Every structure is written in C-alpha cells, then in structure tokens.
A protein has these predicted regions:
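Partner-binding and oligomerization surfaces adjacent to conserved cores of proteins
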Residues: 2-368
Length: 368
C-alpha cells in the first residue's frame, strides 16, 4: 500500500511526489501535453449577480456562452479554503532573510546563537553605515532584482527609524515582515480558470459550479493546429492531488534573486496546482496565467463544441439556453439520471421538442 503523504494523483494516475517534483517545469509540461485532450469542460451556475457599479444584474455564465470567453480569477475565490494557500513559518523566513542580509553586508555571524544575535549584529553594521545613503553604498550586488530588493529593505528600515521612531531591532523585523507578506501574496499575481475532463461529474454538478444541477456545462474543442491554440493549451495543466501540504520555504530562501524556471516550478508544484486528494473526482485542469500576460479578462477561448444542460435546470432557463443554441447551431443535450446506477447520462430526446410539448400541454390546460 502506498504512503498517502508521498504519492499524488494527476489526471487519474498515481505518482510519487518526489518523481513529479524531479520532472521540473519543462518535464511536467511535456508530460501533460504530449497527448492533448480533444475537449475540456467548464461548469457554469447560470445565475445572476448584481453589479453595484453598473447598477444592473449580470449572468456571467450566459455571457461566457454568448461571447465564447472564460474568466480567470484569484484562487481565494474558489470553494476550497486550502486552494493555493501557503503556510510558511514566519520564524524560518525571518531567520533565512536575516542570514542573507548579514551575508550581503559582510556581518560575521559565526558566534551568533540565534535570531536575536543576528538582528543585533546587523543593527550594528547598519548603524556604522550612518544614514541611508551610506547603507545603500555598502551594497555590492550585481543581480538588479536582488539589489533592488535590498534597497527596498534598507528604505523600509530607515523610514521606520526616522518617521516611526522605532528601535533598530524593531525596524529590521518590521521590514522583513513586509517582505514575508509580499511573498505570501505572490500566488495572487496569477489568475486561474478551472476545467474538468468530463461533463458527467456529480461533484461538479451538485456544487456551486453546477448550481445544484441547475446550471450548464460547456464543452470546448481543443485545437492545437494553430500557434495561438498551442500557446493557450500549453498553459493548461492538470492539478496535483495530494495530502501533503504545500511549503514554499525553499523558494523563499532566495526570493530576492531574479526568478528562474525552477522557481516557477516550485510555485506551481507546491502552490498553484496542489489540491487535497478529497477533490480528485473533479478531474481538474487549470489555465494559469500571470497578470502581465492577460490581455483580456474575460479571455477568448477555444470553440464551443457542445452544451450540457443540468438535470434540474428550470424550465424557463432551459428554453433560453436551447433557443440560443439552436439559433447559433451549437449542439446541446440534457442530462438525466441513469436508472441502473448513480451516473448522469445523456437524454435520448431533444430538449427543444420536450420543452415544446411541455409548453403546448401547459397552454392547453390553461385554455380549458
């Protein structure tokens, strides 16, 4: 029996976490995209939301259908409170950053017994530099991002000393605390849109995504024959389901250096793609883009191939969706409960004809 803390599930298959991590960003991406899915599916609640700034209601689900777009959002808006949440020890982060700053300013920490000693030694060194300009001149780093990071640290320290009247130890700890908060927020610089590999998932239909079976599901046709399509699909990755919590301590140790592809992989492997095994039946894939690479949001996506109507979709909404699909020649199908299992299956009838007969029957009854 496999150790649940050492394994993970990716696209329905079990792997060792250590093997997946060893793939690196390139290896994982190649493995994920070597055999492209022909379709991916996105569940929509088909509900209205009031937008106070516009003083009107929006049905973003129907707008996605009309415009052929998908919306990328922050992970904090997802239904899993652990999603992309980073639990990073403040004490370890503080110790790592202190060690780095002591190294940058040639502070001897060989006799230091702990964090307090390092703070004191660094305080003495910065005090000897005099004012802020003197401390800035003491920086001898070539990496522009690293140099800028240290400059920001110094400006925060000296700002606290002058305007807040803090002591050296307080100012140093406060500056590193701000670095810690900035680092924790790094995952929010990415936006995510979620997809599944099947339109028949009970978990998705019964959740907020499918609005208790009252929403609909859009099937998108994956087309990698164009450069635009390949670029889009290559930014969609399978979720890594595991019971092992994410930890970005390794990445935080050199968070002031120019980021590398390995740094990006650690962010994806331990954060953006990591979810609990409890959610594996969502069969999730994620389109992940950094803020700076999103030209439009909602973003144009692959061609809509088919619409799946929820088993409990209200009559009025079902007519609306069906009529739209018929007008724009988009195939559609209603989902019903299988008589012999707990699976959702496609209805053999045409929703349009069923709804038409239902409407005619209702009109006849009213005319009696």
């Amino acid at each position: 029996m496999s150790d649940i803390n050492k394994t993970c599930i990716i696209d329905g298959k079990e792997y060792l976490l250590s093997d997946v991590e060893a793939m690196g960003f390139n290896g994982f991406s190649v493995s994920a995209h070597v055999s492209p899915y022909r379709s991916l599916f996105k569940y929509y609640p088909n509900t209205k939301k009031y937008v106070s700034s516009e003083k009107k209601y929006h049905n973003y689900s129907f707008e996605a259908l009309q415009n052929g777009t998908i919306f990328l959002q922050d992970a904090k808006n997802f239904d899993d409170c652990f999603d992309c949440a980073v639990d990073l020890s403040w004490d370890k982060f503080l110790e790592n950053r202190l060690s780095n700053y002591c190294n940058y300013f040639d502070v001897d920490t060989s006799l230091s017994k702990g964090i307090a000693d390092k703070i004191y030694s660094l305080s003495v060194k910065l005090y000897e530099c005099g004012m802020l300009d003197g401390a800035l001149e003491a920086i001898h780093l070539t990496d522009p991002i690293q140099k800028g990071y240290v400059e920001l640290f110094l400006r925060r320290v000296f700002a606290d000393l002058t305007s807040e009247n803090k002591q050296w130890n307080e100012a140093i700890v406060n500056a590193i605390r701000k670095e810690y908060d900035d680092f924790i927020q790094c995952l929010s610089k990415f936006k995510i849109s979620c997809f599944s590999t099947s339109p028949y998932l009970n978990r998705m239909w019964s959740s907020a995504y499918g609005n208790n079976n009252q929403g609909f599901c859009i099937e998108y046709e994956i087309d990698v024959t164009t450069e635009e399509g390949r670029n889009l699909y290559n930014n969609i990755y399978p979720v890594i389901y595991s019971q092992h919590r994410n930890d970005l301590l390794q990445l935080s140790e050199h968070c002031d250096l120019s980021p590398t592809k390995e740094d990006l992989w650690q962010m994806f492997f331990n954060g953006l793609l990591r979810k609990s095994l409890h959610w594996q039946d969502q069969q999730e894939w994620r389109l992940i883009l950094a803020d700076g690479f999103i030209d439009k949001n909602p973003k144009p996506f692959f061609k809509i191939k088919r619409i799946y109507l929820g088993n409990k979709m209200p009559h009025k909404e079902r007519i609306k969706i069906v009529n739209y699909c018929r007008k724009h020649t988009i195939p559609y199908v209603g989902l019903v409960r299988d008589k012999d299992s707990f699976n959702l299956i496609e209805c053999e009838g045409d929703c349009y004809l069923c709804q038409r007969r239902r409407t005619e029957k209702s009109l006849k009854e009213k005319s009696k």
